[in-house]
């Protein structure tokens, strides 16, 4: 698509970025208020981190906020599928987060209570019970696991399709692809966005630029937003070893930084190297680190022998977003200018983040979440030693 922004060029809200976060924000704003919304996406909707992801959706967060966001997202994915008359793309396989050390066991046991408080069905599964329920996992390695039966994953291309389709059906939303936002200036009553397809005026702007845009878009209005990008890697295997059940439940070895989920008749493994640092290239595609893959492979083959010695069908490495505490940013740091970022969990939290951003725009506050977990200002303050970071996250860089 080319040419100028068509139709009206004056909006109530301009969303910068048409990934999972920007699309869900536009969709929820339109459904709830009928506001006129423009989504400016410099490429194709959903084609940033969103379609490159593994799509894991877990309600087993590492804090109450994380658990609430996971629960709400799961519900919203399912509802959208129903509304569109299409499959939601969500598969509830059940999900084990395994504890390999005593320290993990203790904190995971505490988290079971936190998640239950947030309304998530969650239990501790001991080794004997684990062997009975999920015999394919090598429980010799573990001290137990937390488990939620209706966690799972969403197939990322379907999630992107549905969110794009939902936005496209809303009469008050215009989705502009190949529309890069290059400058943002304040004007009376709002903002003017200079884009590659002409000017857009809006009373309010939502920065949903993702790993490769949130920081840069905020900088256009002089704000410093600590959203960075780092490599995350995926491999898929076309099938499992002979006699293995399929689909099998997801599992996550947080300490080792990898997780395994079903993919078609085989499996997908996602992994992050704790030694990788923020990637400044600006690219979504990053070189795959085969040395790291070979170093970690024996670990997951030992934990889940169904994958032992299998050929790979696909392998890719891409930019994942992260924030310093792995929690999201949902804030209005300047009047009428909003920042939305997923802290690397934009598939499991994307729909809920869109809903919470709609709360903030329409009602002035994101309902049901503590401000200190989501505001931008938390990063500039002295660290409160009692404040919990989300420990159920990949080993993202510290800076
Ligand atoms: C390999 C991998 C695996 C992952 N697995 C999971 C997972 O299992 N579960 C999970 O929850 N999360 C996962 N993630 C993270 C998840 O994909 C992201 O958190 C999520 O997609 C972020 O959504 P977003 O909308 O913020 O970003 P994006 O999808 O990147 O969308 C941002 C959009 O903004 C656009 N943009 C940027 N700047 C501008 C500009 N100036 N003008 C116009 N448009 C602009 C970009 O083109 C892009 O399309 C994974 C990520 C990767 C890379």
What annotation goes with each model-predicted range?
Residues 8-10, 87-99, 111, 123-127, ...:
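Helix-loop-beta segment of a Rossmann-like dinucleotide-binding subdomain
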Residues 30-50:
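Glycine-rich FAD pyrophosphate-binding loop
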Residues 54-59, 93-97, 220-247, 295-302:
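Central beta-strand plus flanking loop segment that forms part of the substrate or channel wall
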Residues 54-133, 257-259, 300:
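Dinucleotide-binding Rossmann-like beta1-alpha1 core, especially the glycine-rich loop
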Residues 147-203, 212:
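Helical element adjacent to the flavin cofactor pocket in flavoenzyme catalytic cores
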Residues 207-222:
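Flavin (primarily FAD) binding-site architecture
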Residues 224-226, 240-335:
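Active-site lid/adjacent beta-loop-alpha segment flanking the redox-cofactor pocket in flavoenzymes
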Residues 298-399:
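C-terminal catalytic lobe of FAD-dependent flavoproteins
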């Amino acid at each position: 698509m080319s040419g100028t922004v068509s139709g009206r060029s004056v909006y109530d809200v301009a969303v910068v970025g048409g990934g999972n976060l920007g699309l869900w924000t536009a969709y929820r704003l339109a459904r709830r208020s009928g506001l006129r919304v423009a989504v400016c996406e410099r490429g194709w909707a959903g084609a940033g981190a969103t379609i490159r992801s593994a799509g894991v959706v877990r309600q087993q967060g590492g804090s109450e906020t994380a658990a609430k966001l996971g629960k709400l997202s799961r519900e919203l994915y399912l509802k959208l599928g129903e509304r569109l008359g299409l499959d939601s793309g969500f598969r509830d396989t059940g999900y084990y987060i395994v504890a390999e050390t005593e320290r993990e066991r203790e904190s995971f046991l505490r988290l079971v209570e936190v998640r239950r408080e947030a309304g998530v069905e969650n239990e501790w599964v001991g080794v004997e019970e684990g062997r009975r329920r999920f015999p394919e996992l090598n429980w010799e390695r573990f001290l137990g696991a937390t488990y939620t039966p209706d966690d799972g994953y969403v197939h990322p291309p379907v999630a992107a399709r549905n969110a794009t389709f939902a936005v496209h059906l809303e009469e008050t939303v215009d989705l502009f692809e190949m529309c890069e936002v290059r400058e943002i200036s304040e004007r009376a009553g709002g903002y003017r966005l200079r884009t590659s397809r002409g000017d857009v005026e809006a009373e309010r702007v939502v920065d949903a630029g993702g790993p490769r845009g949130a920081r840069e878009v905020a900088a256009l209005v002089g704000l410093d937003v600590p959203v960075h990008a780092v490599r995350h890697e995926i491999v898929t295997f076309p099938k499992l070893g002979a006699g293995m059940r399929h689909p099998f439940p997801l599992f996550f070895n947080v300490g080792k930084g990898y997780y395994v989920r079903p993919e078609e008749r085989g499996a997908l493994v996602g992994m992050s190297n704790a030694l990788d640092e923020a990637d400044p290239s600006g690219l979504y595609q990053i070189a795959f680190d085969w040395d790291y893959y070979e170093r970690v492979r024996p670990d997951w083959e030992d934990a889940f022998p169904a994958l032992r010695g299998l050929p790979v069908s696909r392998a890719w490495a891409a930019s994942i977003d992260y924030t310093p505490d792995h929690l999201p940013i949902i804030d209005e740091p300047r009047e009428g200018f909003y920042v939305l970022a997923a802290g690397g969990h934009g598939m499991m939290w994307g729909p809920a983040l869109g809903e919470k951003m709609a709360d903030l725009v329409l009602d002035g506050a994101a309902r049901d979440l503590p401000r200190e977990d989501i505001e931008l200002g938390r990063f500039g303050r002295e660290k409160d030693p009692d404040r919990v970071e989300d420990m159920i996250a990949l080993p993202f860089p510290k800076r």
